[in-house]
């Protein structure tokens, strides 16, 4: 029996096409015979799972960091930690270390950090210091030099990565019932000098600086922003601090 060349060519091409189709189909799935039954083993897209992360935060400062006259969970480092927990995956964990005490100056804070000797592997560090330098009448030159020293110490606590430091401005206690006992404008003018120095240094060295002083200057008009001691910020005031700190903190540790 002789096939017409035209039909032979057609049959040949059809056969080749079928073989190619079968070949590529086999590349997409394989069949495995188990206990006499054919099971299809279809490759699945590999989904990369996020591994649990542990973030370590350290906050350095004075009464504004330790949260004088508010509950432990009300102080701003705790509120910041809790806000980060809500933002990140449930499997992630956060640790918070605070080195701060009411009345501390820059000198006191430097000594305390040296004494505590915290590890250098933190994910984020905050620094808020200087009000007691002003209140105790320490020379401004002391703040100028020791603030820079504290910035460098803080950076060392996050693996020498300045992008993981947030400097927070000094609150203004002039706008509290206690602060009203002093000459109007005197406290605010001095604290402006402290904050301006810190802000300029941070700008020059590409360090994040968060200004919260204006929040505390609403304390007379809005007494809810002042704690029960008539001097320090309330939990509400600290929550407003965190509103400004949170997006920056997320960006730094994400």
Give the positions of each predicted feature.
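Serine-esterase "nucleophile elbow" of acetyl-processing enzymes
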Residues: 33-100, 114-120
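Bacterial signal peptide processing site
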Residues: 27-29
């Amino acid at each position: 029996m002789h096939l017409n060349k035209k039909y032979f060519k057609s049959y040949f091409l059809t056969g080749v096409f079928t073989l190619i189709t079968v070949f590529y189909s086999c590349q997409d799935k394989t069949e495995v015979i188990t206990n006499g039954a054919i099971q299809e083993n279809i490759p699945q897209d590999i989904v990369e799972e996020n591994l649990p992360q542990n973030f370590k935060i350290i906050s350095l400062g004075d009464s504004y960091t330790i949260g004088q006259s508010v509950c432990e969970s009300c102080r701003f480092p705790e509120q910041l930690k809790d806000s980060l927990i809500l933002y990140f995956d449930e499997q992630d964990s956060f640790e918070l270390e605070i080195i701060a005490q009411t009345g501390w100056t820059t000198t006191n804070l430097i000594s305390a950090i040296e004494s505590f000797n915290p590890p250098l592997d933190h994910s984020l560090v905050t620094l808020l210091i200087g009000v007691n330098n002003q209140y105790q009448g320490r020379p401004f030159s002391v703040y100028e030099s020791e603030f820079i020293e504290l910035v460098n110490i803080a950076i060392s606590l996050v693996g020498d990565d300045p992008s993981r430091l947030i400097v927070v401005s000094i609150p203004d206690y002039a706008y509290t019932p206690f602060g009203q006992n002093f000459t109007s404008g005197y406290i605010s003018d001095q604290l402006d000098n402290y904050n301006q120095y810190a802000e300029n240094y941070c700008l020059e060295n590409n360090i994040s600086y968060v200004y919260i002083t204006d929040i505390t200057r609403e304390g007379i008009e809005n007494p809810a922003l002042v704690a029960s001691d008539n001097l320090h910020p309330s939990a509400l005031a600290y929550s407003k601090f965190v509103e400004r700190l949170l997006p920056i903190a997320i960006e730094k540790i994400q």
